[in-house]
Structures are given as C-alpha cells and as structure tokens.
C-alpha cells in the first residue's frame, strides 16, 4: 500500500511545501543515496539539504534513482538547499547555486535559503568545497562586507531565471527580517530556525507567521544531534527523549517522545525536517498527525523553554547574531 500523502503548507508565492521533510544534515556520504531513496519510498517528498552538508551529490543520486524507477517525478519532489557563508557576494551566488544544481542533478531547486546572515571571504570551489569555516587563511575567520540585501537581490534574479522556485532565510532574527523587507522585491517564503522545547522563540515565530512567512524547525529533538557531535552544552543538557514531561505526555497518548516533539511543532503551524537511519523511524517520524496535544500538554511543554540554543555562531568566532 502506498504511503499516505503528507499535508502541505501553501507558501506566500502560491507554491506548496510538504509540512514534513527529511533532513539531510549529517547524512553520511556512504549511505546518503540509499537513505534518501528509502525515504522517498516511505512517502517523504521534501529533502532539506545544504551546500555545507557536503552530501548533495549523494542526495541527488537517491532522488535520481527514485525518479528513474518511476517512484516519483521531479515535480513531486521538493528540494531545499542553502547558500553557504563564503558565497554571499552577488557575483558568487550563481556559482554556488550552479554547483548545487549539478550535484543534485536537477535544473532548479524548490527552495534556496541564505544559511546564515554571515559573509565569509570567498573561497573558490576548486580550492575547497564545501569550505565550512575555511576562509583561505588557515584557521582564521575572514569576513566580507556584503549587505544581506545585496545577496538577496542576487537570489531574486535567480528566481526570475527559473533556477530557484522559492527563496528564504535560515537563522535570521526578527531585526534582520525587518531590514530585508525594506529592500526585497520577493518576500522570503520560509524562515528556518532552531526550534525545540528548550528554545521555543514564540515572538519570532508569531511575527513570521503574521507576515506570511512559513516557519520550518530544525533540531526538533533539541540537544540530540549535538550530543552526537560531543558538544559540551548538549552533553550537559537533559535529553528531551528522556525528559519526564515529554515521556509523560507520550505515555498519555500512547506515543513515543519523538512523535510528541514533532506534533508539538506541527500544532504550532511549523514544518519539521527530522531524519533517521531506521526504516521504522522513517515511518514513525512522518505519522504523528493522528493525535492532538491538549492545552494542558502545551502548557507543560511551554514551561521547558529556557532559551537554550545549540547552534550559535557566537561559539564559532563571537559572531553576535543572537546576542
């Protein structure tokens, strides 16, 4: 039996984006193609990737295999990628996008986000790709004076050229959204942010939704992904999977903690992009829409908010995006 369709959000440009996607961050290159292919077979249609993840070739292979086998068409797949920090200069934006399109083996991406509001020094693709934190000077961070609006204007041109269907931003605070609105011709369709019970960001999410921007949550399970990276802050934070509040709500609804965490975001009108290597979890992570959290559940989860951010550029080089 075919998997049931995933509900979609209508973006402010009229296009539809699945409300549940498959996150490609930290997908191992040796297994990424198979994982993406299996996720498509399990009913996933949105794949959230990025230049910085270093696995877009493999993601593209998984998508291509599914298309070649007739499981899906390109039009049924929603591919998200993100412009990395080294490519913010308008003259480098299309170069970076073309690399993504080549790696994904497609003519366009459905959504292209500015990954962070940070402009590093340009590093040629042939020198190092993805460059990560490399700025051409050993371990030193080197920045370029590129206003966000200039980068945005370059993305708008690529929408008009047909290489991108929707554009948006990631890791932007409200003040930068306001600044972007002053000069943007195309409004951001999506805002992607870290979002979990320890970092609920209610005002930012309320504002984005009020002005017609769809919000996508990453790291819906809180410290989990960062524990796997041995991040000290995450290692010293109680896992949400074992938190008494989350476990009690899960038991009440006969669900597992992951389903509660994803359902909590969904009921806030937020898209989610979990990932899993396990086939049974692939199904579980996209089937949380069959129950409702109560007002009391929400009140209990809201008490867990401690404004604890795990993905903070301040940790890189004292970059003050969220201070």
From Swiss-Prot:
What reaction is this protein's catalytic activity? xylitol + NAD(+) = D-xylose + NADH + H(+); xylitol + NADP(+) = D-xylose + NADPH + H(+)
Active-site residues (renumbered) = 53 (proton donor)
Q: Enzyme class, one word?
A: oxidoreductase
What domain of life does the UniProt record list for this protein's source?
A: Eukaryota
Looking up InterPro entries in the UniProt record yields: AKR, AKR2B1, Aldo/ket_reductase_CS, NADP_OxRdtase_dom, NADP_OxRdtase_dom_sf
User: So where does substrate get bound?
Assistant: 115
| Signal peptide span | none
Q: What is its EC number?
A: 1.1.1.307
Q: Where is this site: Lowers pKa of active site Tyr?
A: 82
Question: Where NAD(+) is bound, by residue?
Answer: 219-285
Extract one GO BP annotation from the record.
Answer: D-xylose catabolic process
Q: Indicate yes or no for the key word 4Fe-4S.
A: no
- Print the keywords alphabetically: Carbohydrate metabolism, NAD, Oxidoreductase, Xylose metabolism
| A molecular function (GO) term | D-xylose reductase (NADPH) activity
Function of the molecule: Reduces D-xylose into xylitol.
Stated family: Belongs to the aldo/keto reductase family.
Q: Can you name this protein? A: NAD(P)H-dependent D-xylose reductase
Task: Give the classification, highest ranks.
Answer: Eukaryota, Fungi, Dikarya, Ascomycota, Saccharomycotina
């Amino acid at each position: 039996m075919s998997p049931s369709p995933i509900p979609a959000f209508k973006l402010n440009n009229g296009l539809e984006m699945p409300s549940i996607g498959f996150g490609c961050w930290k997908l191992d290159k040796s297994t990424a193609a198979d994982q993406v292919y299996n996720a498509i077979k399990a009913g996933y249609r949105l794949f959230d990737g990025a230049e910085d993840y270093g696995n877009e070739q493999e993601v593209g292979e998984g998508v291509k295999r599914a298309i070649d086998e007739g499981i899906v068409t390109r039009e049924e797949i929603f591919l998200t990628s993100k412009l990395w920090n080294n490519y913010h200069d308008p003259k480098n934006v299309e170069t970076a996008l073309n690399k993504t399109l080549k790696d994904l083996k497609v003519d366009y991406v459905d959504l292209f986000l500015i990954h962070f509001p940070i402009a590093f020094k340009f590093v040629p693709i042939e020198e190092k790709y993805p460059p990560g934190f490399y700025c051409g000077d050993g371990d030193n961070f080197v920045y370029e004076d590129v206003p966000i609006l200039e980068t945005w204007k370059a993305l708008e041109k690529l929408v008009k050229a047909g290489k991108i269907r929707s554009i948006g931003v990631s890791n932007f605070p409200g003040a930068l959204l306001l600044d972007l609105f002053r000069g943007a011709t195309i409004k951001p369709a999506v805002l992607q942010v870290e979002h979990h019970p320890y970092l609920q960001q209610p005002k930012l999410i309320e504002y984005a939704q009020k002005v017609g921007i769809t919000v996508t949550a990453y790291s819906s399970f809180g410290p989990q992904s960062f524990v796997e990276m041995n991040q000290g802050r995450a290692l010293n934070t109680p896992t949400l999977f074992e938190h008494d509040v989350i476990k009690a709500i899960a038991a009440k609804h006969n669900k597992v903690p992951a389903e509660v965490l994803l359902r909590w975001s969904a009921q806030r009108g937020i898209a989610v992009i979990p990932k899993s290597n396990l086939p049974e979890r692939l199904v579980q992570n996209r089937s949380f829409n069959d129950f409702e959290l109560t007002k009391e559940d929400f009140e209990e989860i809201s008490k867990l908010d401690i404004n604890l951010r795990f993905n903070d550029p301040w940790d890189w080089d004292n970059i003050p995006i969220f201070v």
